């Protein structure tokens, strides 16, 4: 088995999918998991990007079905901007599409800035823009878990195969969640699910960005990665990609393994 095949298997990627079937499987997963845990529903941060829009709509469909079947579940969508979000219009469009039971907004700027100032005062140096970006992601995680803890809700994560293979998420930030309904999907497969669900094309054709950096607001994921999502998707779907692209992907996969594992102990061997 080639490394490419090993990665596809490890990340549960299917080269070809039926969007209708995948939607059904993922809604059922959300329903089954919330029933099994006894939780009261879900909470998810909505950025206006493809991934949170898709996960949010799947969550809302799941809680509606649970209620139609005589159960009780709710979904809270959370906006978590740092000051003014450049693409706020897209976030509002996503909320309109998702139709969450409840939507709330937390501006994380005061919390992030207070922490950054305290860090500088105590340690005598400023946080790098990169590390401050990770603080933003982790404050968003803390906010979602605070809501989840108060309301008895599970925190949904938006990680999918194209992020998992590169480790392109903040450990214990957007990587911190209770369940991941998009696991196994490539970026283009996620787009296909949104198309099937009737989303406005603006929500899945827009340039993906983590938007965590003050110095480079709205920087494209592909710029930071040095790899396009089409190349990632081709690789994950078992297609041929240029040798240098495959090497980049496989190197990122190897060095980011710690992000896909629980914290290491001396009894684990995945890191050796």
From Swiss-Prot:
UniProt xrefs under SUPFAM superfamilies: Adenine nucleotide alpha hydrolases-like
Gene3D superfamilies recorded: HUPs
- This protein's species is Bacillus cereus (strain B4264)
Can you say what this protein is called? NH(3)-dependent NAD(+) synthetase
Q: How does it assemble?
A: Homodimer.
The positions annotated for binding Mg(2+) are 51, 163
Family membership: Belongs to the NAD synthetase family.
The protein's job, in short, is: Catalyzes the ATP-dependent amidation of deamido-NAD to form NAD. Uses ammonia as a nitrogen source.
Q: Which residues bind deamido-NAD(+)?
A: 138, 171, 178, 258-259
Matching PANTHER family, A to Z?
Answer: NH 3 /GLUTAMINE-DEPENDENT NAD + SYNTHETASE (PTHR23090), NH(3)-DEPENDENT NAD(+) SYNTHETASE (PTHR23090:SF7)
Gene, per the UniProt record: nadE
Looking up Pfam families in the UniProt record yields: NAD_synthase (PF02540)
Annotated EC: 6.3.1.5
**Pathway, according to UniProt?**
Cofactor biosynthesis; NAD(+) biosynthesis; NAD(+) from deamido-NAD(+) (ammonia route): step 1/1
InterPro entries noted in UniProt: NAD/GMP_synthase (IPR022310), NAD_synthase (IPR003694), NH(3)-dep_NAD(+)_synth (IPR022926), Rossmann-like_a/b/a_fold (IPR014729)
Q: Which keywords appear in this protein's UniProt record, sorted alphabetically?
A: ATP-binding, Ligase, Magnesium, Metal-binding, NAD, Nucleotide-binding
For this record, the Gene Ontology CC terms, alphabetical, are:
cytoplasm
Gene Ontology molecular function: ATP binding; glutaminase activity; metal ion binding; NAD+ synthase (glutamine-hydrolyzing) activity; NAD+ synthase activity
Q: State the superkingdom.
A: Bacteria
Provide one Gene Ontology biological process annotation: NAD biosynthetic process
Quote the catalytic activity from the record: deamido-NAD(+) + NH4(+) + ATP = AMP + diphosphate + NAD(+) + H(+)
């Amino acid at each position: 088995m080639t490394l490419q095949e090993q990665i596809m298997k490890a990340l549960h990627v299917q080269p070809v999918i039926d969007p209708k079937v995948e939607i059904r499987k993922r809604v059922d997963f959300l329903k089954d998991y919330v029933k099994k845990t006894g939780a009261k529903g879900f909470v998810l941060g909505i950025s206006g990007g493809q991934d949170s829009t898709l996960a949010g709509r799947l969550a809302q469909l799941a809680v509606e079905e649970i209620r139609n079947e005589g159960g009780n579940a709710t979904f809270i969508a959370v906006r978590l901007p740092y000051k003014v979000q450049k693409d706020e219009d897209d976030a509002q469009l996503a909320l309109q599409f998702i139709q969450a039971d409840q939507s709330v907004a937390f501006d994380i700027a005061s919390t992030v800035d207070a922490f950054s100032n305290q860090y500088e005062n105590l340690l005598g140096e400023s946080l790098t823009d990169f590390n401050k970006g990770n603080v933003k992601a982790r404050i968003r995680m803390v906010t979602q878990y605070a809501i989840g803890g108060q309301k008895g809700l599970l925190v949904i994560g938006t990680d999918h195969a194209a992020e998992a293979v590169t480790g392109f998420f903040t450990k214990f930030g957007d990587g911190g969640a209770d369940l991941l309904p998009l696991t196994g999907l490539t970026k283009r497969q996620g787009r296909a699910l949104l198309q099937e669900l009737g989303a406005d094309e603006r929500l899945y054709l827009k340039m993906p960005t983590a938007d965590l950096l003050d110095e480079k607001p709205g920087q494209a994921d592909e710029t930071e990665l040095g790899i396009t999502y089409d190349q990632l998707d081709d690789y994950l779907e078992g297609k041929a990609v240029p040798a240098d692209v495959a090497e980049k992907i496989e190197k990122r996969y190897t060095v980011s393994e710690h992000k896909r594992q629980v914290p290491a102990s001396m009894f684990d061997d995945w890191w050796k």
